[in-house]
């Protein structure tokens, strides 16, 4: 069975894992943390969720679905990737995994301005996504 290592356990990585497992691949998802989605308090604009859901809960559901279908999830940090004639060697902090293919779904880092105390106001006036967060501030001064 062809093997796939997906680096990144956010929405893109988990969606890819679900599709790849259903296509008959042996899939391992490697992720080091919950990323930006895991820090999101309220999601109100995601199709299929009529009630507010947290990013952590959405990730939890996505992981459960991927695992139920057969993907293997590992919380670890990738330290390198090497390619040889036999495929890829993905080096992590807890060992090495081999795969026929590697998919990178590492997301993008949030650009936080270097302003003292800014973190304490995130979600309480400081926002990084106008399209996502504008609704929360409608009608407020």
Show the residue positions of the predicted features.
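FAD-binding core/adjacent interface of flavoenzyme oxidoreductases
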Residues: 1-5, 23, 73-140
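Beta1-alpha1 glycine-rich phosphate/pyrophosphate-binding loop at the start
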Residues: 2-60, 64-67, 140-141
């Amino acid at each position: 069975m062809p093997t796939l290592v997906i680096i990144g356990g956010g929405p893109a990585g988990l969606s890819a894992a679900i599709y790849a497992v259903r296509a008959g691949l042996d899939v391992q998802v490697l992720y080091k943390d919950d990323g930006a989605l895991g820090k999101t308090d309220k999601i109100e604009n995601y199709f299929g969720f009529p009630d507010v859901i947290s990013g952590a809960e959405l990730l939890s559901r996505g992981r459960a679905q991927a695992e139920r279908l057969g993907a293997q999830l590992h919380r670890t940090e990738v330290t390198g990737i090497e390619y040889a004639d036999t495929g890829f060697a993905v080096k992590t902090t807890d060992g090495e995994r081999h795969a026929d293919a590697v998919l990178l779904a590492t997301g993008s880092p949030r650009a936080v301005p270097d302003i003292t105390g800014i973190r304490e106001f995130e979600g309480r006036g400081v926002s990084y996504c106008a399209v996502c967060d504008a609704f929360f501030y409608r009608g407020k001064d």
